[in-house]
C-alpha cells in the first residue's frame, strides 16, 4: 500500500522569493496543520463486553501512563457499547470500532484524521483476526491466540504508521513469520537430538 507523503517544507527565504516572483505563497499555519501525516493511528485496543482491556497498543504520548489509558478506554467503552454506530468522537479524537460476540475492537486517530482511512485499518484488523481465530472472534479464542493477534497488529500498524490495509497481505506475512519461527524451533530441536545421539554412541563405545 502506498503511504501518503507530507508536503515538502520551504527552506528559509524560498517563500519570500516565490511571492516576489508571483509564485504561490508559502503554506499558512492553518494549512500546515492539515498536512497529511504518516503517523495516523494513535491507538488500537480490544476490550471485552465489560470494558476490560484484552489487548492495547498506544503510538504516541497522548495518554502517557497506563492509568490514563485505562480511563480513556473506559470512557470510550461507555460511549460506544450501547450504540449501533461505528464511529465516535471523544476528547478531540476520532474513534472507529466494531463489536463481535463479547469483544470490541477500536482504532483511534486524531479529530482531523480521515475516517475512511481509520475504517480501512479497522476492517483489515478484524478480517485478519477472524482468519487466525478461524472466524471465532471472541474473548476466549483471542486470549488463547494472543501472540497471533499481536502479530496481526504489528503487520498492520507500526509506531502509528499504517503498513497495510489488505487482510490477505497481513495474513500472508503473519503466516510467513509463524512458519519461520517454527522452522527455527525445529532446527534447534534437531540439533539437540543429534547431540543426544552422539553422546549416547560415545558412551556405548
From Swiss-Prot:
Residues 1-12 have a biased composition (Basic and acidic residues). Gene3D superfamilies: 3.30.450.60. Residues 1-33 are annotated as: Disordered. Keywords: Cytoplasm, Cytoplasmic vesicle, ER-Golgi transport, Golgi apparatus, Membrane, Protein transport, Transport. Its main location: cytoplasm. Residues 13-30 have a biased composition (Low complexity). Oligomeric complex. The coatomer is a cytosolic protein complex that binds to dilysine motifs and reversibly associates with Golgi non-clathrin-coated vesicles, which further mediate biosynthetic protein transport from the ER, via the Golgi up to the trans Golgi network. Coatomer complex is required for budding from Golgi membranes, and is essential for the retrograde Golgi-to-ER transport of dilysine-tagged proteins. The zeta subunit may be involved in regulating the coat assembly and, hence, the rate of biosynthetic protein transport due to its association-dissociation properties with the coatomer complex. Belongs to the adaptor complexes small subunit family. This is Coatomer subunit zeta-2. It comes from Mus musculus. The lineage of its organism: Eukaryota, Metazoa, Chordata, Craniata, Vertebrata. The gene is Copz2.
Amino acid at each position: 500500500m502506498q503511504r501518503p507523503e507530507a508536503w515538502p517544507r520551504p527552506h528559509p527565504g524560498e517563500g519570500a522569493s516565490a511571492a516576489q516572483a508571483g509564485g504561490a505563497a508559502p503554506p499558512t499555519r492553518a494549512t500546515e496543520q492539515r498536512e497529511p501525516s504518516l503517523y495516523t493511528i494513535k491507538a488500537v485496543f480490544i476490550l471485552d463486553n465489560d470494558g476490560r482491556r484484552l489487548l492495547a497498543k498506544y503510538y504516541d504520548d497522548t495518554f502517557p501512563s497506563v492509568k490514563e489509558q485505562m480511563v480513556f478506554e473506559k470512557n470510550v467503552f461507555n460511549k460506544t457499547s450501547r450504540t449501533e454506530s461505528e464511529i465516535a468522537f471523544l476528547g478531540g479524537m476520532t474513534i472507529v470500532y466494531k463489536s463481535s460476540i463479547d469483544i470490541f475492537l477500536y482504532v483511534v486517530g486524531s479529530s482531523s484524521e480521515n475516517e475512511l482511512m481509520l475504517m480501512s485499518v479497522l476492517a483489515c484488523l478484524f478480517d485478519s483476526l477472524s482468519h487466525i481465530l478461524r472466524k471465532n472472534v471472541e474473548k476466549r479464542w483471542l486470549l488463547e491466540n494472543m501472540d497471533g493477534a499481536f502479530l496481526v497488529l504489528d503487520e498492520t500498524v507500526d509506531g502509528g504508521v499504517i503498513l497495510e490495509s489488505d487482510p490477505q497481505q497481513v495474513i500472508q506475512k503473519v503466516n510467513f513469520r509463524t512458519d519461520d519461527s517454527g522452522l527455527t524451533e525445529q532446527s534447534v530441536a534437531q540439533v539437540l537430538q543429534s547431540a543426544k545421539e552422539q553422546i549416547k554412541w560415545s558412551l556405548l563405545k
